[in-house]
């Protein structure tokens, strides 16, 4: 292998290490930003946000959906994993409030008996707009979805930051490997050349 290729290996290694350092810095900054943003919201898990208690509440509400297995009861939400956990509990709370129905499954308008309807003629009249009154259960679901999506986005952002850190470490190790291999080859080449020069001198001296 020629010397330019060996030097190219060293340069490539240095570039990979530089990219690795950059990726780690960006990843750490991203995770720190997620943590700071969540801390500013001062979100704390409610007392029932444990697997055991939410299972009892879900059973009483007649829910048959998958339940959270994490625990954030009384815990300040300051990282992506806890944000995702909190969002899962929020969804269960919303289902309890809507009788286990999602937004699309609920009637569009409110009725006097609370059952709801999608028929405008049977709906309660909104005193302000004089039109059919919207189903309040749907508003609960909209609020939960908006907040839950924001929390899930925080989890995704934190995961991307972690991925950047891992990739940065991998790039640094790869770059270091290139440098070690290239430096080793250069060292062996130098030794070989010095050995050849010495042998030539000895041969010349012997010939004289």
Model-derived segments and spans:
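Membrane-helix exit/juxtamembrane interface segments
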Residues: 22-55
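Residue-level marker of positions within ordered structural domains that often coincide
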Residues: 22, 95, 156
């Amino acid at each position: 292998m020629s010397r330019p290729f060996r030097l190219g290996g060293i340069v490539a290694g240095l570039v990979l290490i530089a990219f690795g350092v950059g990726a780690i810095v960006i990843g750490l900054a991203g995770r720190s930003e997620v943590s700071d943003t969540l801390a500013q919201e001062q979100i704390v898990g409610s007392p029932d946000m444990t697997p055991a208690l939410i299972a009892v509440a879900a059973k009483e509400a007649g829910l048959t959906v998958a339940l959270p297995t994490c625990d954030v009861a009384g815990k300040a939400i300051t990282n992506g994993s806890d944000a995702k956990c909190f969002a899962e509990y929020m969804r269960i709370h919303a289902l309890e409030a809507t009788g286990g129905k999602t937004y699309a499954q609920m009637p569009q308008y409110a009725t006097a008996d609370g059952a709801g309807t999608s028929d405008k003629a049977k709906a309660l009249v909104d005193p302000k707009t004089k039109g059919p009154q919207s189903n309040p259960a749907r508003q609960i679901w909209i609020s939960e979805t908006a907040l839950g999506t924001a929390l899930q986005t925080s989890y995704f952002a934190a995961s991307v930051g972690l991925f950047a850190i891992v990739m940065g470490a991998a790039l640094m190790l790869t770059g270091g490997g290139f440098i070690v291999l290239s430096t080793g080859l250069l060292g062996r080449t130098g030794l070989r050349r010095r050995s050849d020069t010495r042998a030539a001198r000895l041969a010349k001296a012997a010939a004289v």
